[in-house]
Amino acid sequence: LMGIGGALTGCGPAFIDLIIEALGDAGVKYGVPRKQAYEMVSQMILGSAKLQLQTGEHPGVLKDNVCSPAGTTICGDALEHAGIRAGFIDAIDAVMNK
């Protein structure tokens, strides 16, 4: 059986690639060329990861820091309503139970 470290670091890249693909598809939907959309999303993920590593801040704090009251980013909480957090946890559960 794969340990949790292996599950997070071995399977995690595929999950992140799915995020890149999905956000890239959203960019394409709104007129961004696919290659450019993937680059934009990949750079955003890289920047977010670097910021978390450099500051040591809890990811929830970093998320809240970029959400203005009644702003556009907080509208993205639709991801929570769609169950993204539970989906990731369920995916790791499936890996751990394989």
What are these regions (language model features)?
Residues G10-L18, Y38-S42, C67:
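Alpha-helix N-cap/helix-start motif at coil-to-helix transitions, marked by capping-box chemistry
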Residues L1, I19-L23, M44, T72:
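N-terminal alpha-helical segment
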Residues L1-A14, P33-Q36, H58-P59:
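Conserved Rossmann-fold dehydrogenase catalytic segment
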Residues F15-V32, D77:
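N-terminal glycine-rich phosphate-binding loop for ADP-containing cofactors
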